[in-house]
Regions:
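Transmembrane alpha-helices
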Residues: 84, 88, 120-154, 177-181, ...
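Generic hydrophobic transmembrane alpha-helix motif, especially the helices
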Residues: 57-93, 100-101
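Transmembrane-helix boundary motif in ABC transporter permease subunits
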Residues: 26-56
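Hydrophobic alpha-helical transmembrane segments of polytopic membrane proteins
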Residues: 163-201
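Short cytoplasmic-facing helical segments at TM-TM junctions of multi-pass membrane proteins
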Residues: 97-139, 163, 167
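Periplasmic/extracellular loop-to-transmembrane helix junction in inner-membrane transport proteins
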Residues: 1-29
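Alpha-helical membrane-protein architecture signal
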Residues: 10, 14, 18, 48-52, ...
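Short cytosolic juxtamembrane segments of multi-pass membrane proteins
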Residues: 199-212
Length: 212
């Protein structure tokens, strides 16, 4: 706790939290946008699903940290590389959950909407996404967890800012108390995000769908 106090006093802890969270938000936003788009295409177009469906499942099994070498080659030691690792670690969880959610929508529900004139982006935003919302929330929650691990892991390996960097500084200086203190902060942020964001969303979904 003393190390947390020192970090808070000199601002390094708050700066590290802000840096990591910014990278996380950007990477997760990219993953959510890309994952929803890809998942809907896979669910609505069988040729797309047959072409890349198995590939998406395979790519999801790759740990985020395994993308670090490619990130370094393509982006160098930069924020873009860390954001890439963050986004790629989360996008496939969002994709798979979106695909599952859209696939589980009653076809008659979609046909009724189309008969009423819904098509294109209107069909997606007004019909498909609301109907698949419970699955989307599950995908966002999984994606957040993967993204948070990805950003911290990438920062440990090639960053000069962020919570992962502070962890690495503790390792290099053999400062066990600093390492543990930063780990506590990382865990605390995870608990807060889960409780303040995803628990509330899940409760709303359960209430909306009559599950709670």
């Amino acid at each position: 706790m003393q190390d947390l106090g020192y970090g808070a006093a000199d601002g390094s802890l708050f700066y590290g939290i802000g840096t990591s969270m910014l990278r996380l938000i950007v990477g997760l936003a990219i993953a959510i946008a890309g994952g929803i788009t890809l998942g809907i295409f896979m669910a609505r177009m069988e040729t797309v699903n047959q072409t890349i469906g198995s590939l998406v499942l395979g790519l999801q099994s790759i740990p985020s940290i395994a993308w670090v070498p490619l990130a370094l080659i393509w982006f160098g030691v930069s924020d873009a590389g860390i954001i890439f690792v963050t986004a790629i670690g989360a996008i496939f969880a969002v994709t798979i959950n979106t695909y599952t959610g859209v696939k589980n929508i009653d076809p008659h529900y979609i046909e009724a909407a189309q008969n009423m004139g819904a098509k294109g982006s209107q069909l997606i935003t007004m019909v498909l996404m609301p109907a698949a919302f419970p699955y989307l929330i599950s995908g966002f929650k999984q994606g957040w967890a993967f993204a948070w691990r990805g950003v911290i892991g990438a920062e440990i390996l090639f960053s000069f800012l962020g919570l992962g960097f502070l962890l690495n500084v503790g390792r290099q200086t053999i400062d066990v108390s600093q390492v543990i203190a930063v780990m506590v902060v990382i865990m605390g942020i995870g608990i807060l995000v889960d409780g303040l964001v995803f628990k509330r969303l899940e409760n709303k979904v359960m209430s909306r769908w009559g599950l709670g």
